C-alpha cells in the first residue's frame, strides 16, 4: 500500500510566488545535506504559483503557474474559471499548502478565494501567511486582518507569522537577514509536512 501523500504547495501573490523558489532551494539543499535524511518514504511535493503579475511568475521555478487579471471580485474570478483551473492544477492532491504574504490586495483577496474554491472541491488545505511589517502602514494591516479572518474559516490549519516579531528579535541584523529569517520560517513550516506519517 502506498501511503505517500501528494502535497501541492501553492504560492499566492508576489511573495508567495517568490517563496516557491526559496522553498524548493531549501528542499534541494536538505536533500544534499547528510544531516537531513530524506528517503523514498517522504511525501511528494509539487510547487505552483498564482499571481496577477506576469514577471513574478516568469521568474518562478514552479511546475505550473496561473496568471490572473487584477480584477479579483467574485464575478471576475468566476469569469476566469478559477475553480476549474484549480481543479486541473491541484485536483489530485492529498493536501494543498497555501503560502502568502498578507497586506497587499492580491494575496489578501485571492488567498481566501482560493481556499474557498479548494474547500468546495473537497481538497484539504492548510496555509502559512505572514502579516506585514509595521512600516507598511495601517491599510496593509487592515487588509491582512480581513484576509486572515476569512482564511481561518476555510482551512484546516493556519499558521500566521508576525513580521514585527521577527524584526523585534533580529536586533543588529540587516534588512536582508530579517527577510531571510521570515523565508526560513515559511520554508520550515512547509517542509514539516515531508514525513509520510503526516495525515491530511
Regions found by a protein language model. Give the residues of each.
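Tubulin/FtsZ superfamily GTPase core signature
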Residues: 1-200
Amino acid at each position: 500500500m502506498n501511503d505517500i501523500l501528494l502535497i501541492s504547495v501553492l504560492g499566492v501573490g508576489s511573495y508567495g510566488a517568490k517563496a516557491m523558489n526559496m522553498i524548493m532551494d531549501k528542499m534541494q539543499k536538505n536533500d544534499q545535506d547528510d544531516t537531513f535524511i530524506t528517503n523514498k518514504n517522504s511525501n511528494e511535493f509539487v510547487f505552483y504559483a498564482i499571481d496577477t503579475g506576469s514577471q513574478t511568475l516568469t521568474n518562478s521555478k514552479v511546475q505550473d503557474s496561473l496568471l490572473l487579471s487584477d480584477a479579483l471580485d467574485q464575478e471576475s474570478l468566476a469569469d476566469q474559471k478559477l475553480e476549474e483551473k484549480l481543479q486541473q492544477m491541484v485536483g489530485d492532491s492529498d493536501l494543498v499548502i497555501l503560502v502568502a504574504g498578507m497586506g497587499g490586495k492580491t494575496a489578501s483577496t485571492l488567498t481566501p478565494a482560493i481556499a474557498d474554491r479548494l474547500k468546495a472541491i473537497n481538497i484539504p488545505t492548510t496555509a502559512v501567511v505572514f502579516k506585514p511589517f509595521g512600516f507598511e502602514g495601517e491599510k496593509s494591516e487592515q487588509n491582512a486582518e480581513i484576509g486572515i479572518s476569512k482564511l481561518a474559516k476555510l482551512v484546516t490549519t493556519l499558521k500566521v507569522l508576525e513580521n514585527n516579531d521577527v524584526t523585534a528579535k533580529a536586533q543588529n541584523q540587516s534588512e536582508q537577514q530579517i527577510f531571510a529569517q521570515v523565508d526560513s520560517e515559511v520554508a520550515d513550516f512547509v517542509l514539516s509536512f515531508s514525513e509520510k506519517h503526516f495525515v491530511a
